[in-house]
């Protein structure tokens, strides 16, 4: 009976939830809106090029470590593209 009310999330949904949590954590760390961080990440391709492909490794790390990694990658990718945050 307990299983009747359960729902299942596929891997794509899990990765998207994880990416969303990364956006939120970075926004909280730098003190700006999630919308602004999402736009910055999207502009440099960080979600599709770093967070989603790195899910298998990243999701096993601490929230602090993931946040630092993602923020560091964002700053490096912006710098490489000549974008000033």
Locate each region found by the language model.
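Membrane-interacting alpha-helical segments
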Residues: 1-7
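N-terminal acidic leader/helix
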Residues: 7-36
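Amphipathic alpha-helical interface segments used for dimerization/assembly
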Residues: 27-30, 41, 74
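Amphipathic alpha-helical interaction segments
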Residues: 29-33, 48, 77, 81
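Alpha-helix initiation and N-capping motif
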Residues: 34, 44, 63-67
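Amphipathic, hydrophobic secondary-structure cores in small proteins
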Residues: 35-58
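Long, compositionally biased
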Residues: 54-85
